[in-house]
């Protein structure tokens, strides 16, 4: 596995599956796991501290509410951690965004947008990071970007179907 996709609870999967789907497009291997910062802190510590030795290169961590998972993951590993705020009913994910983005100096978490777009972009960003040293993955990322560009160029008039 190259990327770890972790989430605070199973209910976060409808959001986090978009990271997995993006990684599938680029042929990047990943694992998925529920790892709660609050309910299973020892599991989190074990998961994050062993990630590099297990072959992971990037960890995508999605969480809602207090959203301590990405920051605590980053505290236990030197790997890049990408945080995805999961949208909640109470505050629409803003609480999660603030929890993830406001990390203290010295413990970095790359924070993405709230919800589905953030999860998909976390998958894309993970592929870009891996692509730095993997030409095959980078080629697929570049083809993805070119396809997006061509789609806009092929449909410049919003009034046409």
From Swiss-Prot:
Which residues are listed for substrate binding in this entry? 9, 12, 39
Query: A single Gene Ontology molecular function, please?
Result: 5-(carboxyamino)imidazole ribonucleotide mutase activity
UniProt KW Transport keyword: no
Pathway the protein contributes to: Purine metabolism; IMP biosynthesis via de novo pathway; 5-amino-1-(5-phospho-D-ribosyl)imidazole-4-carboxylate from 5-amino-1-(5-phospho-D-ribosyl)imidazole (N5-CAIR route): step 2/2
Q: Which UniProt keywords apply?
A: Isomerase, Purine biosynthesis
**Domain of life, per lineage:** Bacteria
> TM segments?
none
Q: InterPro entries in the record, alphabetically? A: PurE_ClassI, PurE_dom, PurE_prokaryotes
* Any one Gene Ontology BP term: 'de novo' IMP biosynthetic process
Write the Enzyme Commission number(s) for this entry: 5.4.99.18
What this protein catalyses is: 5-carboxyamino-1-(5-phospho-D-ribosyl)imidazole + H(+) = 5-amino-1-(5-phospho-D-ribosyl)imidazole-4-carboxylate
**PANTHER family attached here?**
PHOSPHORIBOSYLAMINOIMIDAZOLE CARBOXYLASE, PHOSPHORIBOSYLAMINOIMIDAZOLE CARBOXYLASE CATALYTIC SUBUNIT
**Task of the protein:** Catalyzes the conversion of N5-carboxyaminoimidazole ribonucleotide (N5-CAIR) to 4-carboxy-5-aminoimidazole ribonucleotide (CAIR).
**Which family does this protein fall into?**
Belongs to the AIR carboxylase family. Class I subfamily.
Q: What is this protein called?
A: N5-carboxyaminoimidazole ribonucleotide mutase
Species whose genome carries this gene: Vibrio cholerae serotype O1 (strain ATCC 39315 / El Tor Inaba N16961)
């Amino acid at each position: 596995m190259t990327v770890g996709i972790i989430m605070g609870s199973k209910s976060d999967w409808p959001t986090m599956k978009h990271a997995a789907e993006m990684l599938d497009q680029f042929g990047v291997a990943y694992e998925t796991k529920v790892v709660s910062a609050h309910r299973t802190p020892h599991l989190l510590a074990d998961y994050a501290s062993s990630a590099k030795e297990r072959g992971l290169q990037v960890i995508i961590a999605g969480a809602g509410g207090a959203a301590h998972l990405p920051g605590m993951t980053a505290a236990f590993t030197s790997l890049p951690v990408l945080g995805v705020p999961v949208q909640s009913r109470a505050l629409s994910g803003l609480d999660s965004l603030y929890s993830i983005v406001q990390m203290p100096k010295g413990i970095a978490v790359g924070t993405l947008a709230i919800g589905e777009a953030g999860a998909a972009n976390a998958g894309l960003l993970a592929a870009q990071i891996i692509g730095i040293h993997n030409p095959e993955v980078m080629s697929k990322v570049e083809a993805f970007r070119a396809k997006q560009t061509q789609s806009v160029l092929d449909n410049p008039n919003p009034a046409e179907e």
